[in-house]
UniProtKB/Swiss-Prot annotation:
Organism of provenance: Methanosarcina mazei (strain ATCC BAA-159 / DSM 3647 / Goe1 / Go1 / JCM 11833 / OCM 88) (Methanosarcina frisia)
InterPro entries attached to this UniProt entry: Glyco_trans_28_C (IPR007235)
Full protein name: Uncharacterized glycosyltransferase MM_1636
Example GO molecular function: hexosyltransferase activity
Pfam families: Glyco_tran_28_C (PF04101), Glyco_trans_1_3 (PF13528)
Keywords linked to the UniProt accession: Glycosyltransferase, Transferase
Family of the protein in this entry: Belongs to the glycosyltransferase 28 family.
SUPFAM superfamilies per record: UDP-Glycosyltransferase/glycogen phosphorylase (SSF53756)
Its EC number(s): 2.4.-.-
Length: 379
């Protein structure tokens, strides 16, 4: 089959799971092309896949550890391209795919629908209107319009793929709210993770070891600094801090001896596998990667970002790790780290999810779904 994969470029998690799916599809002999923008486009290109530049849809901005909704809406409108729709339509017409897979990229979803091409939508959040709750009246009205728009899109897609564990283990469950009429369209694939636990080699890290994955947004710098302060409180716990592409490690002058800082790392899986816990924001894909590798999570969701806060709340409630905040002092962060390291229940719970991820094999499951459903229409 010929398959077009569209990727939302806000947050690298969309890209990582689409690369996982692309790897699986290519290995099975399918012809794949990607559409992406921003960092996502760069990552796909570096991987060596065929990639097309597509118009951006959403622009996320923040400040001092918080998600700035009004600023994000303004930035999105400023970056909107009037001719974006025709460009995406032409891209699809030129490639002539048998099926379109869209990871939260709605312009590509609508274009596929317009051309009567089967479309499979990958999302880990359906209640986007929650972003707009308790805001000013104009933004609340925008939330109502958003809800109606997404409901229409969901009804017209061939399938909605949730790249998460099936219930009751679904980490993004607080972000999902589908009407009963859509339930038969939902497909819980399991995590879409590019590497398999058993295929990733461990690296020699001094134990116990914490890896911090702070990436994407410069406004997460305060928590980066706070982790450095936390590390200085106990030299017996070792840290690797991966700063992300928008944060320059050279700006940090006093680095504790038990800390190494790395710039953007192309492959974080060896660090996730070899560490005893992962410090991360509340992004869904990073959580899926950590849990698929059986590593507990210390989550610092972006303040005001309801999707991340909901993900982190499930991590806390289910005992997969701890939910912290940007206001949590270093002394408390350290105690939470010690708790996760010392209390066996955290490791036992995430090891169960590691086994389940292996059994589900998300990329393979989605490939087989596409072959079974879209492949029938092609033949």
């Amino acid at each position: 089959m010929k398959i077009m994969i569209f990727i939302c470029g806000e947050g690298l998690g969309h890209t990582s799971r689409c690369l996982a799916l692309g790897k699986e599809l290519l290995a099975a002999g399918h012809e794949i092309e990607f559409g992406a923008y921003g960092y996502s486009r760069d990552l796909v290109e570096k991987t060596g896949y065929r990639i097309h530049e597509i118009p951006s849809e959403i622009k996320l901005v923040g400040k001092a550890g918080g998600f700035d909704l009004s600023g994000s809406i303004e930035a999105t409108l400023k970056n909107a391209r009037i001719l974006g729709g025709p460009k995406v339509l032409k891209l699809i017409k030129d490639f002539k795919p048998d099926v379109v897979v869209s990871d939260s990229y709605y312009l590509g979803t609508l274009a596929a629908m317009l051309l009567n091409i089967p479309v499979y939508l990958i999302i880990n959040q359906s209640n986007m209107e929650d972003f707009f709750k308790n805001r000013g009246v104009p933004i609340r009205l925008l939330g109502d319009l958003t809800k109606k728009f997404y409901r229409e899109v969901f009804e017209k897609t061939d399938k909605i793929i949730i790249p998460d564990y099936p219930l009751p283990y679904t980490v993004c469950r607080k972000n999902l709210n589908f009407s009963p009429g859509l339930w038969e369209k939902l497909y819980y694939s399991g995590p879409l993770v590019k590497e398999k636990y058993e295929e990733v080699e461990q690296i020699p890290l001094k134990k116990p070891h914490i890896v911090s994955l702070i990436g994407g947004f410069g406004y997460r710098e305060p928590i980066f600094r706070k982790v450095l302060t936390t590390a200085a409180l106990d030299s017996g716990i070792n840290y690797t801090l991966i700063s992300g592409p928008s944060l320059d490690p050279s700006k940090f002058k006093e680095i504790p001896k038990n800390v190494q800082i790395l710039r953007f790392v192309g492959d974080t899986f060896p660090y996730i596998r070899s560490s005893d816990a992962v410090i991360a924001p509340g992004g869904h894909s990073t959580m899926m990667e950590a849990l698929s590798f059986g590593t507990p999570i210390l989550s610092f969701p972006d303040e005001g970002h309801s999707e991340q806060e909901n993900n982190a709340a499930v991590i806390e409630e289910e005992g997969y790790g701890r939910m912290l905040s940007y206001s949590t002092p270093p002394e408390v962060i350290l105690e939470c780290i010690r708790e996760v390291l010392e209390d066996k229940k955290y490791r036992d719970k995430v090891k169960r999810l590691q086994r389940l991820a292996s059994e589900l094999d998300g990329p393979k499951a989605v490939r087989e779904l596409l072959e079974k459903e879209a492949g029938k229409k092609v033949s």
